[in-house]
Amino acid sequence: MLNDEALVERWLGPGGPELQAEVIRRLRAGERLDGLALDRIDGRWDLRGLGAPEPRAAEPDSTTRQSGGMSFTFEFSDVAATLEFQRARLVDLDLRGAHLPRLRLFGCVIDNSLFDGAHCVGLRMWATDVSDTSFLAADLARSSVGGWYAGRGNRLRKVDFRHADLSRLGCGVASFTDVDFAHAQLECTNFWQASLVRCRFAGVLREVVFDGRVLEPERDLGPNPMQDVDMRGVTAFDDVDFRGVSFDRVTLPDHPALVVVRGVARVEAGLQRLADRDDHAAQEARGRLQHLRKFMGVAGGADQALIDMRTLIDPEAALLLRVLLT
């Protein structure tokens, strides 16, 4: 089993800490792992259960502020990265069940590796390529794969994030190709200026933003398409926002409550028809149309939007919107 005590114990028993330190040193230095007391599993070096040492936080600083006649004291401290890799090649590694919190990757390559069930909370990467790698059921909460460094973003190709914890994941300006997000926890995740090509989503999407607009033209990012994206397995769009996204090559669930709106003119016409109405259904419908209008056809985005009628509180508002938009 991935979390079996034996996987961790071998790094803690006689010679284990020294072996672990040497493995990490070689990986950081770009040296091969040949000659170490390591086995291979399906062609990958067996590093299952590897645990990077936890850094100690600096002594907390404190500051006191006055507000409204009351005094508030805040304490804060910096937590260092657990491991930092510069231009390293992490290739053919089996790191299932590893403990690697707050990993930092600059200009690295990860290829043909397994991080299934690994604890990688707070991962950060810049100008890094990840390919043919699995993070199945890994804990990547509060991580970021959206850093901009050395004039480029991160590129992820053929990566498996199924059932992974990706909550509060930073994805800005990253490129995702053939990536599987099925049943991953994506709460509070923003695909900001991210490219999604041949990707799959399934399960509940909650508080996710897909932003296809070009918001930083000075970076020459090019288009941020959603192409051949499979969302047929999504069971709920809970507070999910699509901004400037084209649905021409997005496969949505076959559900009558999902309505793709094409053209801001249709939204404008709907708002005009609601101008003289003040009932509850009209108010909710108007608010939804005003929100859609903000992100349609502006800043390089597509002139399309998506409404999930199930998310409206008033059933009459859903009926009204359907009449106005279809």
Segments and roles (model prediction):
Residues M1-P53, G263-T326:
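N-terminal capping/linker segments that flank leucine-rich repeat
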Residues G13, P17-R266:
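Tandem repeat scaffolds
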